[in-house]
């Protein structure tokens, strides 16, 4: 494949934007390949400005659960935009999407719409602290909850130590109110609560970690979080920005049967437009302004375009949708294991609904430390060879791949064949 136009576009972009991009992963640095500039998408396919076609497993990093340019979503967006883009006042569309979210998400009795997943997690932590009167938050290593200061935190030097800034610009005073423990490790969480329990406002977790590859919870982990937070009077917060409506019809909490106090949403609920949301029990949500004293606001929160795209996306999802995802996922997982075994290359495949992650190691992979043992050099080679075969994968080992309703068995079979061809070139 040729990337002449993308390379030229990137040279211009680098003079205009830091690194030439508006989000770091789009620079493709970890796979040592030129950034690709996209032109359009249709169904399960995406097309770059050089005219190359790919089967798309990035799907705008998760939101496009119906694939690109779904006819129903696009048609209703045209109708909405003809009425205006934003009004600074409420619309009936907000009621429609809010009701649908409340009906499907077990933990949500009331919901507040925002404009991004980062806003959702940031506002949820403020709400948790305001509601409990406590300061500290527990997060898990490898889980990403957006780029707010209190969540860009890495672990300290030992189990359940106070956090350290993970980015320049994050004050130590903020970092010290974030406790980081290993994912899937209830013993570490218990130690954290034994040391700081009286001042822990909440525990925030991706119920399926999707930002260190895809790592599902081990059996009993989520229920353990529920039990421990309840015991200490802290709030359990599920960050379902990625897993929401991807893992199951009732989100990850419905799939695993564990109900948090608060839930953060994003990605799928906007159908490709900027959106986020957070919700939970009425008694907690009613502490937010204008009913309560905990402040939250947003100029474009609940804007009619995002509400339209979100509603028309979610309204097309049904329990049968997830049966289809499981069928495609089974074929892809079996094919990956078969092809990698054929070439004597170790692989660990993790799945949850329409989220799939593969690690180039023996496994198992249940936490960030194990994820880091994946062969990153081989992953980069694999990415480059798969792009040549017309398959667009996330350009990072630590991002998940996604399926959409637009993907077909033929797409999956072509992808498996592409892996076989790529490995044939890589493994001598």
From Swiss-Prot:
Pathway(s) where this gene product acts: Porphyrin-containing compound metabolism; protoporphyrin-IX biosynthesis; 5-aminolevulinate from L-glutamyl-tRNA(Glu): step 2/2
UniProt keyword annotation of Secreted present: no
GO process terms (BP): protoporphyrinogen IX biosynthetic process
UniProt xrefs under InterPro entries: 4pyrrol_synth_GluAld_NH2Trfase, Aminotrans_3, Aminotrans_3_PPA_site, PyrdxlP-dep_Trfase, PyrdxlP-dep_Trfase_major, PyrdxlP-dep_Trfase_small
Segments passing through the bilayer: none
Entries under CDD domains matching the protein: OAT_like
Pfam entry (one): Aminotran_3
Entry EC number(s): 5.4.3.8
Catalytic activity: (S)-4-amino-5-oxopentanoate = 5-aminolevulinate
Cofactors named for this entry: pyridoxal 5'-phosphate
GO molecular function list: glutamate-1-semialdehyde 2,1-aminomutase activity; pyridoxal phosphate binding; transaminase activity
GO cellular component: cytoplasm
Modified residues (N6-(pyridoxal phosphate)lysine): 267
Coarse class of the protein's main subcellular location: cytoplasm
Compartments where located: Cytoplasm
Organism superkingdom: Bacteria
Keywords linked to the UniProt accession: Cytoplasm, Isomerase, Porphyrin biosynthesis, Pyridoxal phosphate
HAMAP family on file: HemL_aminotrans_3
Assembly behavior: Homodimer.
Protein family (similarity comment): Belongs to the class-III pyridoxal-phosphate-dependent aminotransferase family. HemL subfamily.
Protein name stated in the entry: Glutamate-1-semialdehyde 2,1-aminomutase 1
Organism: Staphylococcus aureus (strain bovine RF122 / ET3-1)
């Amino acid at each position: 494949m040729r990337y002449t136009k993308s390379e030229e576009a990137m040279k211009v972009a680098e003079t205009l934007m830091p690194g030439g991009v508006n989000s770091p992963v789009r620079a493709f640095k970890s796979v040592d390949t030129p950034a690709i500039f996209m032109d359009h998408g249709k169904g399960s396919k995406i097309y770059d400005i050089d005219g190359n076609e790919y089967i798309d497993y990035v799907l705008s990093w998760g939101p496009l659960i119906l694939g690109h340019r779904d006819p129903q979503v696009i048609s209703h967006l045209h109708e909405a935009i003809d009425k205006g883009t934003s009004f600074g006042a409420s619309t009936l569309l907000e009621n429609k999407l809010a009701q649908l979210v409340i009906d499907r998400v077990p933990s949500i009795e009331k919901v507040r719409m925002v404009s991004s997943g980062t806003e959702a997690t940031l506002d949820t932590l403020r709400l948790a602290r305001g509601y409990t009167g406590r300061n500290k938050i527990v997060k898990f290593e490898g889980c990403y909850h957006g780029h707010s200061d209190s969540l860009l935190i890495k672990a300290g030097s030992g189990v359940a130590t106070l956090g350290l800034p993970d980015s320049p610009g994050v004050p130590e005073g903020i970092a010290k109110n974030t406790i980081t423990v290993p994912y899937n490790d209830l013993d570490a969480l218990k130690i954290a609560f034994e040391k700081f329990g009286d001042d822990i406002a909440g525990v925030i977790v991706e119920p399926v970690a999707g930002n260190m590859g895809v790592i599902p919870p081990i059996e009993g982990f989520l229920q353990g979080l529920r039990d421990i937070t309840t015991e200490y009077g802290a709030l359990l917060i599920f960050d379902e920005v990625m897993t929401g409506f991807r893992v199951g019809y009732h989100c990850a909490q419905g799939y695993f049967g564990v109900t948090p106090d608060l839930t953060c949403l994003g990605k799928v609920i906007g159908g490709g437009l900027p959106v986020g949301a957070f919700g939970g029990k009425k008694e907690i949500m009613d502490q937010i302004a204008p009913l309560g004293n905990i402040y939250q606001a947003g100029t474009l929160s609940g804007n009619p375009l995002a509400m339209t795209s979100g509603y028309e996306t979610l309204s097309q999802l049904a329990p049968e949708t997830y049966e289809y995802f499981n069928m495609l996922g089974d074929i892809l997982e079996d094919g990956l294991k078969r092809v990698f075994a054929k070439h004597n290359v170790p692989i660990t495949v993790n799945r949850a609904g329409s989220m799939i992650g593969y690690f180039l190691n023996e496994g198992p992979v249940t936490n960030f430390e194990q994820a880091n043992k994946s062969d990153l050099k081989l992953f980069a080679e694999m990415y480059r060879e798969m792009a040549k075969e017309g398959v667009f994968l996330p350009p990072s080992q630590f991002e998940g791949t996604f399926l959409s309703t637009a993907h077909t068995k033929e797409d999956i079979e072509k992808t498996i064949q592409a892996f076989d061809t790529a490995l044939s070139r890589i493994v001598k």
